[in-house]
From Swiss-Prot:
One of its GO terms (cellular component) is plasma membrane. The keyword Hydrolase does not apply. It comes from Bacillus subtilis (strain 168). Induction: Negatively regulated by YtrA. This is ABC transporter ATP-binding protein YtrE.
Amino acid sequence: MIDVQHIDHSFTIGKKGRENEVPVLKDVSLSVAKGEIACIVGRSGSGKSTLLNLISGYISPTKGRIVINGTDVTGFNEKEWAQFRLDHFGFIFQSFQLIPGLTTYENVEMPLALKGIKPSERKQKVQDMLKRVGLENHAAHYPNELSGGQQQRVSIARALILNPSIILADEPTGSLDSETEHEVLELIQQLNRERGITFVIITHDDEVASIGHSKFQLHDGVLKGGITVEV
């Protein structure tokens, strides 16, 4: 499903002619199987977000190879990556990333519209998804009318609406209290079991990491190895 092979990534800093390469990831390899929840754990600055951005094609590796769903995506251009993300990925963010001027319904509908699906076909899909995440009675609400947990459920519904095979989640409970965090983690586990979706979650929270089938530890850009855990 996801195969990262000997990835290096560096940032260039300094003025032209006096640039310095700052290594962020160093010879990172990991494999995530179909239907797995994989958690990437590490402190701030360890390279977690960089690795997620590499897997999703927002930045390119300095060295190494990335294969996703059997496709070598390492050399993709921006147009190819945009289509690949639309076809294969859903995203969940700590800050929810909802559009303030759109209702719950419209935020969830947006990926369907971007993919060119007819309005007549979109309605039932959105209604079914809102029911699945427990927000069928909040379709007309705007983000500022929802609690943090409800906003994250909208984000999850939006991530799922195109039936992606992979969900990439960046600190998905970082803005939530402990009770709401538990509810969101339960929802992620249910969706994983029901739909066989692969989740890659980056976190520094042990509670979040505890739901993973495997856990990868990043420390100063070095992957310490995958650990299979009982869930």
